[in-house]
Amino acid sequence: MTVLKMTDLDLKGKRVLIREDLNVPVKDGQVQSDARIKAALPTIRLALEKGAAVMVCSHLGRPSEGEFSAENSLKPVAEYLSKALGREVPLLADYLDGVEVKAGDLVLFENVRFNKGEKKNADELAQKYAALCDVFVMDAFGTAHRAEGSTHGVARFAKVAAAGPLLAAELDALGKALGNPARPMAAIVAGSKVSTKLDVLNSLAGICDQLIVGGGIANTFLAAAGHKVGKSLYEADLVETAKAIAAKVKVPLPVDVVVAKEFAESAVATVKAIAEVADDDMILDIGPQTAAQFADLLKTSKTILWNGPVGVFEFDQFGEGTRTLANAIADSAAFSIAGGGDTLAAIDKYGIAERISYISTGGGAFLEFVEGKVLPAVEILEQRAKG
C-alpha cells in the first residue's frame, strides 16, 4: 500500500488542511470522551513544528446537511484543543471562499457536514476545500470508508494529498495483522448477530488459525453444533452459515457458560456446563473453564485481532469472560490489534490500553478493512501517489 506520507513532506510555509476524526460525544457543551482528539494531537503538533499554516477539519454527529446546528458545532472541540495545546484555536464558520492563515497559525473549521454537498462528495465543494491548501492530509481512519467531500473529493483535487501519521499507523498495523500475520493467529469476533459480522467472519476464516466467537454470534455457532441455547439471542436462519464457517477454520466453542433468567443489571448469574442450559436460560457470558481455555490459546498466539467483548461486560457478573481474555491479550507477547466501540470500552474498563500493541480508532472502517473492502479515502491517496 503506497501512499505519500505527511511525515516525509516539507511543510515549511505551506497551507496544510488536515482531515481528522474529531467526532466525539458532547454533552452540555463539554467533550465526554477525548480519545479521538488525543489521537489527533501528535499530527497537529507535527504540522506546526514543520512550519505549516495548519487548518483542521472534521465532522461531528449527523446534522441536516447544509444547515448549522448548535448541538453539532465543533465549538467544544475548539475549546478542548485550545486547552490541550496551550494556545487559542479559533473556530471558523465561513471558510469555503478562503481564509487568511500564515506559518505557525492553527485554525479549526466548523463541522464539514454543515456544507452542502459534503456527504454526496460534490466536486464543487471538494474543489473549494482543495483551493484552501497546498497540501491535504487525510488522517481520519474512522471515516476512510466513506467517500465524502472532506475525505475523498478534496484528495482528488488538492495539489498534494498525503496520509497523516495516525492514518498511516492504522494501515501499517492492520496490514501487519492481516497481510502477513505471525502465526499462529487468533481472532476474537463477538457481537449480537452473525448477520452484522458475516463478512468479517468469512474473511478471518481464511486468514486466522483460531476463530473465537462470543456474544450472540457464539450462540448461533453453539446451536449449529447441536447445543441448546435456551432463550438466548441467536439467529436460526444462519445456523448453516455458521456450520460452513466452522468447516473452514477452528472455532473453539464454550464448554461452560454464565446464564441468567433475565437480561438485567440485577440478574442472578449461574455458571452451567453447556449441556445443562435450560429452555428459560439466557447465555450472557462464557464460563470460567472456557475463559481459561481461550486464555491459554491466546497466550500461545503470535498475532491476535480482537473485535467485541465475549459477554455482557457492562454488568459485572457477566464480565469475567471478557476480563479474562482482555488480560490474556495484554499479557501475551503477540502483536495484538483491537477495534470497535464496545472493544474500546472494555479495554478502558479493564485498564489494559498500554498493553495492546495497537488500538484502532475506526469502528466501521476497521471492520471494512478486516472484511477486505477497499477504503475509498485510502484508495484515492494511493492513486495520487502513483501520479
UniProtKB/Swiss-Prot annotation:
Q: Where in the cell is it found?
A: Cytoplasm
Ranges annotated as spanning the membrane: none
The record's section on InterPro entries has: Phosphoglycerate_kinase, Phosphoglycerate_kinase_CS, Phosphoglycerate_kinase_N, Phosphoglycerate_kinase_sf
- List of residues binding substrate: 21-23, 36, 59-62, 113, 146
**Pfam family example for this protein?**
PGK
- Which keywords does this chain's UniProt record carry? ATP-binding, Cytoplasm, Glycolysis, Kinase, Nucleotide-binding, Transferase
Q: GO CC terms for this protein? A: cytosol
Q: In which pathway does it act?
A: Carbohydrate degradation; glycolysis; pyruvate from D-glyceraldehyde 3-phosphate: step 2/5
Give the EC number.
2.7.2.3
Catalyzed reactions per annotation = (2R)-3-phosphoglycerate + ATP = (2R)-3-phospho-glyceroyl phosphate + ADP
| Record flagged with keyword Cytoplasm | yes
Tell me, what is an example of a GO biological process annotation in this record?
A: gluconeogenesis
What is said about its interaction partners and assembly? Monomer.
Q: Which HAMAP family match?
A: Phosphoglyc_kinase (MF_00145)
Protein name, per record: Phosphoglycerate kinase
Please give the organism.
Pseudomonas paraeruginosa (strain DSM 24068 / PA7) (Pseudomonas aeruginosa (strain PA7))
Q: Which gene encodes it?
A: pgk
